[in-house]
Amino acid sequence: MKQITFAPRNHLLTNTNTWTPDSQWLVFDVRPSGASFTGESIERVNIHTGEVEVIYRASQGAHVGVVTVHPKSEKYVFIHGPENPDETWHYDFHHRRGVIVEGGKMSNLDAMDITAPYTPGVLRGGSHVHVFSPNGERVSFTYNDHVMHELDPALDLRNVGVAAPFGPVNVQKQHPREYSGSHWC
């Protein structure tokens, strides 16, 4: 057994699917405080050499974390908090999304539509703990609903969802925080 990260910061592994398909790298997020969702990068470390690479760096005040790896290719999925957070829209269970990074390019996994009439295949809130299926075609996640939270926070119960590769799913934006995604949820 050996330690492979040494930088003076918190390195957090998700509790599943953190190995790259070649079993040479572990992926993690980096947080100033281990208890807060305030990390700005998704990274990986080579278990033999200790080399660290940044997979993704957030911008515009967004935070990222809870990364997992595709079982067959170098594709990463993780939580991305809102860009340009403010008093009314900041990181929260119902204000986050799943994103996929492949080949250095980031795309939204899930879409969000919080304005009626709602778009089929689109979430109304935030997703969390994204994990690829064993064949890599689907992604499981947990989910909190912004619309239900606005109605009554007690109604915003966490649910389990699946993102299927039947996208893209395009949202006709009626709210500045709505967005399109690559998968049907």
Predicted regions and their residues:
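Sequence signature of WD/YWTD-type beta-propeller architectures
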Residues: 1-185
